């Protein structure tokens, strides 16, 4: 059976523009909070295939999105490379021993050996393939090497990225060694997600905006493209989505390149600019400002505006970043219904 989301990724004719939301399996859903409480904490939920599959499916049933995205976290990758991960209340993700020296990097597990440790992710995918409706796509994902490296070097989330940037400008060879090690693990990780059954993969570069545009290709984009092209060569039938957040200047300068299918547009990049620079080569995904979900009127206005720019094929509706925890569920449902309404073909 044809999956509308996969068809849209390949610019095929669809009855309407499909829609999903980043972080759609999340804290805005009371049903998600119930399952998370059952798991005990966020990491336990990621490590429990049965419960992770349950929360992955919830947004399809409750909100009506056209695709499911695997419930997991980007930081399971460095965790299985040997960096102990904790989620501390009020602080978010924290690694107990950030990378400071060559010895720290050498101590980590690399390549396929690290990817093989993520069995709970592949098990979740296998459960989902049994339970998802045949017309609904399952999206697998990873963090981009740069975004993963920021946590691995800083030890936690950061507003300044000073340790990463100090390394970027004073010891770029070492930063490239870290990025190479992470890239090699991610390639195997994505391959194993595809082998387990995902229909689409997305690479999230959440902290792309931390890099100045003239350095973005060198320290992030080229590694993302390497992963995408490795996957496209082996699995041409699997769409690859790139989502680098906050790189409007990079887009405007015409610097985006690579063999992938869909470009995720963040809410800070005008959709008209993305269409002008990228729309002929790539399907575009996005890009409503997530805070518009607090108002149904603001949501409808934005959805209609995006539809007016994007028209028919070559587009997937989404937010320009993740849905926030205090958004009313009825407003998320309204967003999905409006996307499907305005794009429905006669």
Curated annotation (Swiss-Prot):
Instruction: Give the protein family.
Output: Belongs to the uroporphyrinogen decarboxylase family.
The entry describes its oligomerization and partners as: Homodimer.
Q: What pathway, per the record?
A: Porphyrin-containing compound metabolism; protoporphyrin-IX biosynthesis; coproporphyrinogen-III from 5-aminolevulinate: step 4/4
Subcellular location field: Cytoplasm
GO CC terms on record? cytosol
Q: Where is this site: Transition state stabilizer?
A: 73
**EC number(s)?**
4.1.1.37
Reaction(s) catalysed by this chain, per the record, are: uroporphyrinogen III + 4 H(+) = coproporphyrinogen III + 4 CO2
Q: What does this protein do?
A: Catalyzes the decarboxylation of four acetate groups of uroporphyrinogen-III to yield coproporphyrinogen-III.
Q: Where does substrate bind?
A: 23-27, 73, 151, 206, 321
Q: Return the PANTHER family for the record.
A: METHYLTETRAHYDROFOLATE:HOMOCYSTEINE METHYLTRANSFERASE RELATED, UROPORPHYRINOGEN DECARBOXYLASE
Q: What keywords does the record list, in alphabetical order?
A: Cytoplasm, Decarboxylase, Lyase, Porphyrin biosynthesis
Q: Biological process GO terms, please?
A: protoporphyrinogen IX biosynthetic process from glutamate
Superkingdom, natural source = Bacteria
Q: Which NCBIfam families match?
A: hemE
Q: What is this protein called?
A: Uroporphyrinogen decarboxylase
**InterPro entries reported for this sequence:** UROD/MetE-like_sf, Uroporphyrinogen_deCO2ase_HemE, Uroporphyrinogen_deCOase
- Major subcellular site: cytoplasm
């Amino acid at each position: 059976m044809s999956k509308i989301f996969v068809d849209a990724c390949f610019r095929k004719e669809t009855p309407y523009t499909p829609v999903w939301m980043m972080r759609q399996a999340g804290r805005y859903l009371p049903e998600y909070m119930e399952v998370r409480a059952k798991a005990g904490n966020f990491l336990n939920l990621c490590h429990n295939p049965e419960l992770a599959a349950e929360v992955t499916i919830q947004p399809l049933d409750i909100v009506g999105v056209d695709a499911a995205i695997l419930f997991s976290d980007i930081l399971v990758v460095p965790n299985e490379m040997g960096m102990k991960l904790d989620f501390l209340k009020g602080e978010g993700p924290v690694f107990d021993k950030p990378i400071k020296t060559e010895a720290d990097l050498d101590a980590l597990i690399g390549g396929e050996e690290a990817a093989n440790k993520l069995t709970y992710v592949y098990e979740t995918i296998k459960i989902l393939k049994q339970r998802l409706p045949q017309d609904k796509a399952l999206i697998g994902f990873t963090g981009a090497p740069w975004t993963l490296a920021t946590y691995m070097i800083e030890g936690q989330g950061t507003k300044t990225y000073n340790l990463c940037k100090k390394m970027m400008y004073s010891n770029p060879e070492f930063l490239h060694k870290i990025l190479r090690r992470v890239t090699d693990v991610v390639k195997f990780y994505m391959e194993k997600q595809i082998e387990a059954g995902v229909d689409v993969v997305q690479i999230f570069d959440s902290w792309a905006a931390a890099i100045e545009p003239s350095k973005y290709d060198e320290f992030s984009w080229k590694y993302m493209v390497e992963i995408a092209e490795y996957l496209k060569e082996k699995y041409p039938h699997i769409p690859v989505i790139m989502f680098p957040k906050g790189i409007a200047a990079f887009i405007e300068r015409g610097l985006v390149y690579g063999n992938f299918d869909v470009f995720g547009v963040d809410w800070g990049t005008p959709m008209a600019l993305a269409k002008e620079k990228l729309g002929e080569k790539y399907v575009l995904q996005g890009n409503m400002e997530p805070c518009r979900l607090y108002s149904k009127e603001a949501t409808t206005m934005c959805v209609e505006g995006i539809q007016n720019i994007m028209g028919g094929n070559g587009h997937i509706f989404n937010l320009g970043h993740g849905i926030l925890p205090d958004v009313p569920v009825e407003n998320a449902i309204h967003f999905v219904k409006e996307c499907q309404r305005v794009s429905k073909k006669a």
